[in-house]
Amino acid sequence: MLSNLPVIFLMGPTAAGKTALAISLCEHLNTEIISVDSALVYKGMDIGTAKPDASELARAPHHLIDLLDPSETYSVADFRRDAIIKIDEFHQQGKVPVLVGGTMLYFKALIDGLSPLPEANVEIRAELEAQAAQYGWPHLYQELVKIDPQAAQKMSENDSQRINRALEVYKLTGKTMTELQKQKQPVLPYTFHQFAIAPTQRSELHQRIEKRFKIMLEQGFENEVSTLYLRKDLHPNMPSIRCVGYRQMWDYLAGEIDHDEMVFRGIAATRQLAKRQLTWLRSWPDVTWLTTGDEENLHRVVSSLS
């Protein structure tokens, strides 16, 4: 059992080189990787998510990948629960857990905890949607302004998903979203060593994203998505199909866009994802930045543990 319970975070935008560094780190520390990626949890979605291949998995076992069928959903709370179980297992074995990925909300949930919000309720959602169909979302928004003005301030009067959720929470608990979000879980007893990796130039990251998307196409990404498309039980509003690249390929297979447009949109969506990830990281407290391709990266991470 490790005394100060160290946990390494290796965060960064998509295509920044996280996996390569993480595998080197695992070989050096004789440990394993916990994936922090909302797309890698899905089975049968390997190429478009850049899931580690067999040789990479042999060098460094990855956990929290291939957990679910693409028809299922995986919440932030599911991740937090599963990650804590794995972290504690590693600590019991005397290993330093290495958490790697770009789903920043998952990392945040580990550090800050989650509010005790209730599960979605189908009946209440349907009731609210029926009211919205009759009176419009701006009418329901005004209701929310009276109940929870602070939550309402953070959304527009046509943000149906968030208005619905805020009113649903109030109907289920009698408490506002704002009240419940202040009730966080206890802080975890770990020492977090937090690193973010990215190229210094945005143009380099864009080149890496474009190159990777084209490699995915060569590896058979179209066939991978076609298999999902032909199942008929999946649709583009599911979290799995909303993953970057999959949604654009889905639209192409549905005949809504041509091949060139699919490639253009796929690369553009991946760039947007990387931009959002970097925005999170620039305001992230206690993070040490690493430059993609720097030979000193491994040494910097390892030396932080001593």
Swiss-Prot record:
**Which EC main class describes this enzyme?**
transferase
Q: Which residues bind substrate?
A: 14-19
Protein residues bound to ATP: 12-19
User: From which domain of life does this come?
Assistant: Bacteria
Chain intervals for the UniProt region annotation (Interaction with substrate tRNA): 37-40, 161-165, 242-247
Catalyzed reactions: adenosine(37) in tRNA + dimethylallyl diphosphate = N(6)-dimethylallyladenosine(37) in tRNA + diphosphate
Task: Report the coiled-coil segments.
Answer: none
Annotated GO biological processes are:
tRNA modification
- Report the cofactors: Mg(2+)
Q: Where is this site: Interaction with substrate tRNA?
A: 103, 125
Tagged with keyword Nucleotide-binding = yes
Cited SUPFAM superfamilies: P-loop containing nucleoside triphosphate hydrolases (SSF52540)
Its biological purpose: Catalyzes the transfer of a dimethylallyl group onto the adenine at position 37 in tRNAs that read codons beginning with uridine, leading to the formation of N6-(dimethylallyl)adenosine (i(6)A).
Per its UniProt record, what HAMAP family does this chain match? IPP_trans (MF_00185)
Of which family is this protein a member? Belongs to the IPP transferase family.
Q: What is this protein called?
A: tRNA dimethylallyltransferase
Q: Which organism is it from?
A: Pseudoalteromonas translucida (strain TAC 125)
